[in-house]
């Protein structure tokens, strides 16, 4: 049995497309130069993406900042928010449940006035068919 000196080449290799030939060449060289052919393009895409996304993110926050406005005391009263009158030194915080503005000290004293030692645990009423957790 005699082996041929020429290597076997399938008939469709001559008619292969450019992308197939480039892909085969890329895969062959990838093991020789992994950083140059894989790592460097990956890092460059990440860095280019950060430069592209920075203006988009800035535009997002600028649009949000345009929506936020400072409200004067009269406008706040018109919105239904009440604040202390004459207390310029007290910082005012918004209470979302009552929509009344009050200072932190006022809230602290209100909580201290409540009797927190005598309380009773009450079960929440469940919907029909909902398990209540009792065994």
Curated annotation (Swiss-Prot):
UniProt keyword terms in alphabetical order: Membrane, Mitochondrion, Mitochondrion inner membrane, Transit peptide, Transmembrane, Transmembrane helix
Which Gene Ontology CC terms are recorded? mitochondrial inner membrane
**Span of chain positions assigned to the transit peptide in the UniProt entry:** 1-22
Please give, as recorded in its UniProt entry, the membrane topology of this protein. Single-pass membrane protein
Biological-process GO terms, alphabetical: mitochondrial cytochrome c oxidase assembly
InterPro entries reported in the protein's UniProt record? Cyt_c_Oxase_assmbl_COX16
Which Pfam family, an example, fits this chain?
A: COX16
| Locations listed in the record | Mitochondrion inner membrane
Primary residence: mitochondrion
Membrane-spanning segments? 34-54
Induction details: Slightly induced during the mycelium to yeast transition.
Q: What protein family is recorded?
A: Belongs to the COX16 family.
- PANTHER family from the entry? CYTOCHROME C OXIDASE ASSEMBLY PROTEIN COX16 HOMOLOG, MITOCHONDRIAL, MITOCHONDRIAL OUTER MEMBRANE PROTEIN 25
The record's function comment reads: Required for the assembly of the mitochondrial respiratory chain complex IV (CIV), also known as cytochrome c oxidase. May participate in merging the COX1 and COX2 assembly lines.
The molecule here is called Cytochrome c oxidase assembly protein COX16, mitochondrial
Recorded source organism is Paracoccidioides brasiliensis (strain Pb18)
